[in-house]
């Protein structure tokens, strides 16, 4: 009788281990998706708050910019940044871009791709 019980318990435990091995990756994937989704929503709500701060900052900075007519033939892109978060959780800047002719900015701001990335409300030039 004890050998039958031992055999049955061995079968049950090996089946349970097999079941755990089969279902563990699925459970882990569900857990990772749930964590990613929660983290993504948290970042998204944070991004909305940052977007509001940046858009109000844009309004203040744009008032201090004096755009003069261009004579050198250079064109500039004035870009307003809206922060959004991609599913990977990385913050990216979504630029709503419109073309302007700009000669100078009277606020000591350097117009370059670097300033566009570091300060999203600023401008970036192209030929």
UniProtKB/Swiss-Prot annotation:
So which domain of life are we looking at?
A: Eukaryota
Q: What's the miscellaneous note?
A: Partially overlaps DAL7.
Q: What is this protein called?
A: Putative uncharacterized protein YIR030W-A
Lineage, opening ranks:
Eukaryota, Fungi, Dikarya, Ascomycota, Saccharomycotina
């Amino acid at each position: 009788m004890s050998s039958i019980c031992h055999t049955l318990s061995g079968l049950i435990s090996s089946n349970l281990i097999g079941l755990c091995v089969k279902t563990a990756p699925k459970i882990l994937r569900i857990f990772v998706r749930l964590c990613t989704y929660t983290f993504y929503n948290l970042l998204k709500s944070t991004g909305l708050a940052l977007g509001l701060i940046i858009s109000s900052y844009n309004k203040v900075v744009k008032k201090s910019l004096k755009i003069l007519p261009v004579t050198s033939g250079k064109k500039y892109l004035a870009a307003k940044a809206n922060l959004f978060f991609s599913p990977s959780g990385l913050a990216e800047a979504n630029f709503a871009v419109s073309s302007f002719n700009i000669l100078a900015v009277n606020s000591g701001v350097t117009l370059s791709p670097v300033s566009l990335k570091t300060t999203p409300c600023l401008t970036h030039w192209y030929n």
